């Protein structure tokens, strides 16, 4: 569902809060640059999407002129809702790297 920039930020906040209160599920965020069509004279824009499984998909198109202001608000929303993130366990990957490098040089 394509929303205005303000509506997108409100819906994204609601979506992240819903998942945080449930304690399960994932929200995927993506960005894609839209190329400039020289024939139409339009400016460059960025498509930003948020997806919560198959249940809810929201998106907005941000014009390059408003991108800095929008991205500051977008970052605040995301940072405010990342409380539930788990720190990645890197111990396993470090052990695997040591095994491959030490066994490779005999």
From Swiss-Prot:
Family matches, as InterPro entries: Signal_recog_particle_SRP14, Signal_recog_particle_SRP9/14
Predominant localisation class: cytoplasm
Pfam families for the chain: SRP14
Source domain of life: Eukaryota
SUPFAM superfamilies xrefs: Signal recognition particle alu RNA binding heterodimer, SRP9/14 (SSF54762)
GO cellular component: nucleolus; nucleus; signal recognition particle, endoplasmic reticulum targeting
Biased segments, Basic residues type: 86-100
Compartmental location: Cytoplasm
Gene3D superfamilies: Signal recognition particle alu RNA binding heterodimer, srp9/1
Biological process according to GO: intracellular protein transport; protein targeting to ER; SRP-dependent cotranslational protein targeting to membrane, signal sequence recognition
Role summary: Component of the signal recognition particle (SRP) complex, a ribonucleoprotein complex that mediates the cotranslational targeting of secretory and membrane proteins to the endoplasmic reticulum (ER).
Protein name, as recorded: Signal recognition particle subunit srp14
Species: Schizosaccharomyces pombe (strain 972 / ATCC 24843) (Fission yeast)
């Amino acid at each position: 569902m394509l929303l205005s920039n303000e509506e997108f930020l409100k819906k994204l906040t609601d979506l992240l809060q819903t998942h945080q209160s449930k304690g399960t599920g994932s929200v995927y965020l993506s960005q894609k640059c839209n190329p400039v069509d020289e024939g139409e004279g339009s400016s460059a824009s960025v498509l930003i999407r948020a997806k919560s499984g198959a249940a809810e998909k929201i998106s907005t198109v941000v014009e390059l002129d408003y991108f800095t202001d929008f991205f500051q608000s977008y970052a605040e929303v995301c940072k405010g809702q990342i409380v539930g993130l788990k720190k990645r366990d890197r111990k396993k990957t470090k052990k695997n790297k040591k095994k491959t490098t030490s066994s490779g040089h005999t």
